[in-house]
A protein has these predicted regions:
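Bacterial N-terminal signal peptides
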Residues: 9-18
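Extended, hydrophobic interaction surfaces within ordered domains
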Residues: 4, 18-21
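Short, polar/acidic, helix-capping and beta-turn segments at strand->helix junctions
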Residues: 21-183
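Bacterial N-terminal signal peptides that target proteins for export
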Residues: 2-8
Length: 183
């Protein structure tokens, strides 16, 4: 009877251990961020070079940190100005969406295949805002909406959307992100 109880105990512990194993959410055969970009008509670009003593991305273990990027358009110009005085919320939203494309381009350059993105963890959106402007989240939604469109549930992230008195070169937004990636 004692041996039977030990076997049952070991069996129950084994079941608990199996139940607590992390589930690999990457097995979804429909997960293809690059195909989604193509469907949306979005072409990735070569990431802009850092303008100071930093790098575009750093990987530590399975974490990928992407440096702040701005709304650099395909014509080589940035969307500039303060949201709430020079730019509307809609223009700020578009600036954040373009910035998301630049962030995704940097992810691709860093890991090679966007299917390696296991989860977008954190997005920090800084809005170059007029002093009385308070709709920062509506602007940063331009980035968040595209990230979720491209990466699906894996793109749902934590976020900060904050207003700044100024940003480098008067760009409309600067956004950085942290992701979990696979080998």
């Amino acid at each position: 009877k004692m041996r039977t109880n030990k076997i049952i105990y070991i069996f129950i512990i084994s079941l608990i251990m199996v139940a607590c194993e992390p589930v690999d959410t990457q097995t979804d055969s429909n997960y293809d961020p690059e195909l989604k970009l193509k469907e949306l008509g979005i072409e990735l670009t070569t990431p802009s070079s850092p303008v100071a003593n930093y790098v575009n991305s750093v990987r530590s273990g399975n974490l990928l940190f992407i440096s702040g990027k701005g709304p650099l358009k395909n014509d080589g110009n940035y969307i500039k100005g303060k949201v709430g005085s020079d730019l509307t919320i809609e223009q700020g939203y578009e600036a954040a969406r373009i910035t998301a494309v630049n962030l995704i381009s940097t992810i691709k350059a860093s890991v090679g295949d966007l299917k390696k993105v296991k989860r977008v963890l954190k997005v920090t959106g800084m809005v170059n805002a007029a002093p009385n402007f308070t709709d920062h989240p509506k602007v940063v939604n331009g980035c968040s909406d595209l990230i979720v469109e491209v990466f699906g549930d894996k793109g749902k992230h934590t976020r900060a959307a904050v207003g700044m008195g100024s940003l480098p070169s008067n760009i409309a937004v600067e956004i950085d992100m942290i992701l979990e990636v696979m080998d």
